[in-house]
């Protein structure tokens, strides 16, 4: 959370000074753009507690097939069964997903060097956003966390407990 905020502040400052629009590239899109071929790619980052941040993309066109989400790894089952094959998983959650679904038909292991987030994937996803005219002003560039930070979750739990105690 903090690293993302610091990175966004740096990008926004540079873009504002240069009067340049920003491409808000999701991590899942950057992972997907780092590989090519036929079939489907799922960008998956380990969100801990048996969950992954994930999104599905067409491997040939990199067209987004699902929104970014934070869900239990088992929640991908319907998408995994129905998507175009072959299917590969990339990101630091790739092994978790692959081990969960490797017995499904059409699931392929991804070579380790292609599983990591690479600058080329970020650049290609950003260029696609530029070409599509979906870049935004620095003021409009905002983080998308997909879930509350641990500190925010703990505060909400304390507030709920206090609310229950006063009722």
Residue ranges of predicted features:
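Short, glycine/acidic-enriched capping/hinge loops at junctions between secondary-structure elements
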Residues: 3-5, 99-101, 157
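General helical structural elements
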Residues: 9, 16, 52-53, 151, ...
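DPxDG-like acidic metal-binding loop motif
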Residues: 1-20
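Surface "functional belts" at beta-alpha junctions
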Residues: 20-117, 131, 145, 150-151
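Acyltransferase
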Residues: 110-167
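Buried hydrophobic packing segments
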Residues: 10-14, 31-32, 122, 126
